[in-house]
Amino acid sequence: MTGVQTCALPISLRAWNADLQIVVAFRMLPEVVWNMPRLGTFNLHASLLPQYRGAAPINWAVINGDTETGITTFFLKHEIDTGEVIQQVHVPIADTDNVGIVHDKLMMLGGRLVTETVDAILADTVKSVPQEEMAVVGELRPAPKIFKDTCRIDWNQPVKRIYDFIRGLSPYPAAWTELVQSDGTAVVLKIFETEKIEHLHESAPGTLQTDGKTYIRIAGTDGWIGVHALQLPGKKRLKTDELLRGFKLTGECRVH
């Protein structure tokens, strides 16, 4: 036995003699913990299970360009995020939403759904559904943990994919790219706010264009990404025109 199984948590929980346990954004629990209450243990998860099982469901829903996500309450079982579904709420994702906005939408609804789920369990009106019996449109997509390397922008893609990737990581942990200046020096550039400029061009992906004053745009495979908010190492997040007032960029710069 390791981790939470060997600590004092099971002993502390048993002392409460709880009828029901609720888990939100916590690590995987051993059966000795989640099987303790007579009415079970349920979890609040930020996706429409069985889609996006894993640590970063909100990020991946936005990164993949989904137009809808939601929250799910489900009973815990051995495999992570696979227990029987109790209730779900669907939430739209606007094309301009970043992960922070979607997170806040889900947070506003999460407390209410937890309360409704508790009431239903106590009233013995729950009819939970095994996830394998639920209708799913398309293939199941995972939501693995996001690391720094996950956040690097691949410019050799359509601008829609790049745009969704950036907003799916904004404001945290933030998508980034390496900016190579005309003298060959390179710095990491975090990008937070963008727009799609779907205009065919002959520039190589990663080509940077700027007037040095008001705009920066970077080439994808089928258009440009207009950059509106960004951050240099050791500096605060700035609007593009603010950054250009203090940092010299030329059209000879590239990103990759």
Feature annotation, model-predicted:
Residues 5, 26-28, 197:
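Short beta->alpha connector loops
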Residues 8-17:
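Short amphipathic alpha-helix with an adjacent loop that forms part of the alpha/beta core around
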Residues 18-142:
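Donor/substrate-binding cores of folate-linked one-carbon enzymes
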Residues 135-256:
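Internal anion-binding site segments
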